[in-house]
């Protein structure tokens, strides 16, 4: 009997993953890919709310499920104010911040908004968990070269923490016992140093680090300043170059790494150079995080959708295997991790945090 139905919603930069769980048992799931031309018509992720909500509605209809059948809805957490990890109720103050348009423009802001919309009519709880703004930085990691622009902790925290726990458990350890470098490779890339249960450093995938399928990553600053001051571009146009139209999209016109591999196999040398350059930058960021951990690295974990790629993974491994063993956990643990958070919240309301 499906008496603990939980709907899980995970909006990413280029996809929306939706799943129906009965407790921790996944009953149904769908991974909807949003191609770059579809998303190009939206000036921000917030503008995609109706578009992404429709995808969730359609999934529920396909599964012959209504919100009234659910016990709870949980969405991926967005770039809110710095928070501790855990599960949060989607209440008025959290909604206000998500709807403000003042947050970092990331698809994860839609997780709580969609969850709340689904839950509202059915009068069931809506949650988020381990939002991208979980902040466990050492103070030294916050310092940039300009006092008014500190480095921020914004990352794919949910999947990183889930895969750290999984790999540690497979080795008879707890997250508090190990030092891992985790490269989350999705539409955006987060490369994190995880020391004894804390994520002490990570690149902000919107601002810096390797370029990715649709983000520009670290760019030459003087060139970027010249573009910004040229008068040719509005702010939103420049932002879209950095987040949404950058990376593989800018170079090759697609955010789909599988398509790029097909081009390479057909003899496209430009596609090979660009994809290998992306792997090169990922490896370089992993090397940087090894210095954060002072070389005391138990394992390097590659996770996310791009960790399935038959070209990218070997290119990374050949550059970083000298640091530590490389463990590949393709795909994401985020759906199950969110479902587990919701189960714990339903079982013990005292663990649910208010924003």
Could you tell me what each predicted segment is?
Residues 29-68, 94, 98-103:
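N-terminal phosphate-binding loop and adjacent alpha-helix
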Residues 240-295:
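Adenine-nucleotide phosphate-binding core of ATP-dependent small-molecule kinases
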Residues 6-47, 207:
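Short glycine-rich, Thr/Ser-proximal phosphate-binding strand/loop in the N-terminal lobe
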Residues 110-117, 128, 143, 148-179, ...:
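Glycine-rich phosphate-binding loop plus the immediately following alpha-helix
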Residues 310, 314-340:
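Conserved phosphate-binding/catalytic loops in two-lobed NTP-binding clefts
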Residues 60-107, 125, 133-144:
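Short beta-strand-loop/turn "lid" adjacent to the catalytic site in phosphate-handling enzymes
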Residues 297-316:
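Glycine-rich phosphate-binding loops at beta-strand->alpha-helix junctions
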Residues 58-71, 169-173, 286-298:
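Phosphate/pyrophosphate-binding loops at sites that engage ATP/ADP/AMP, CoA/4′-phosphopantetheine
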């Amino acid at each position: 009997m499906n008496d603990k139905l939980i709907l899980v919603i995970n909006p990413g930069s280029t996809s929306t993953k939706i799943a129906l769980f009965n407790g921790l048992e996944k009953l149904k799931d769908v991974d909807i890919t949003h191609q770059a031309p579809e998303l190009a018509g939206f000036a921000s992720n917030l503008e995609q709310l109706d578009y992404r909500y429709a995808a969730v509605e359609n999934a529920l209809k396909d599964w012959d499920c209504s919100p009234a059948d659910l016990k709870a809805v949980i969405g991926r957490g967005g770039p809110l104010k710095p928070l501790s990890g855990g599960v949060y109720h989607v209440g008025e103050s959290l909604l206000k911040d998500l709807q403000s348009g003042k947050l970092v423009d990331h698809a994860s802001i839609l997780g709580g908004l969609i969850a709340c919309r689904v839950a509202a009519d059915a009068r069931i709880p809506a949650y988020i968990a381990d939002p991208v703004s979980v902040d466990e930085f050492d103070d030294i990691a916050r310092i940039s070269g300009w006092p008014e622009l500190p480095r921020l902790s914004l990352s794919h925290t949910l999947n990183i923490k889930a895969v750290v726990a999984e790999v540690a458990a497979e080795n008879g350890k707890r997250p508090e016992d190990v030092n891992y470098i985790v490269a989350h490779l999705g539409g955006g890339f987060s490369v994190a140093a995880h020391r004894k249960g804390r994520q002490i450093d990570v690149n902000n995938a919107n601002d810096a680090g390797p370029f990715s399928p649709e983000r520009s990553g670290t760019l030459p600053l003087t060139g970027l300043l010249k573009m910004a001051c040229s008068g040719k571009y509005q702010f939103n146009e420049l932002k879209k170059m950095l987040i949404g139209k950058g990376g593989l999209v800018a170079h090759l016109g697609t955010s789909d790494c599988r398509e790029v591999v097909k081009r390479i196999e057909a003899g496209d040398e430009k596609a090979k150079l660009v994809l290998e350059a992306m792997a090169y930058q990922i490896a370089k960021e992993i090397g940087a995080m090894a210095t954060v951990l002072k070389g005391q690295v138990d394992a390097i974990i590659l996770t996310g959708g791009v960790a399935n790629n038959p070209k990218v993974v070997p290119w990374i491994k050949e550059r970083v295997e000298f640091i530590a063993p490389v463990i590949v956990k393709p795909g994401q643990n985020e759906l199950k991790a969110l479902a587990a958070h919701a189960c714990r919240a339903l079982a013990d309301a005292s663990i649910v945090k208010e924003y």
